[in-house]
Amino acid sequence: MKLHSFATNRTLLTFDDGTELFFSYATPVAGYSRSLHGYFRTKSWYSSTTTRHINRYLNEYADVPNPEQNVHHVDQSAITKLVSTQIPSRY
């Protein structure tokens, strides 16, 4: 597992299996997962700042060509489930 902080309030967590979880502030909002069929972003809207964070992650870091066509929009619950799968709670 690797933690990469891009800037204040933008963090990427990468796992050994290739899964990526991108956080804006403390919320996982985008990433990459084979189980979610590639790159994904939340369908939920949080703020214009979070939207900019997601777009920068997909366009600059992940370098996804044509993100509008190549990124799946998923329910926030799917991202939350992915987090709990990758980081099981001990409680």
Please place each PLM-identified region on the residue numbering.
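Terminal leader/tail segments of proteins
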Residues: 1-91
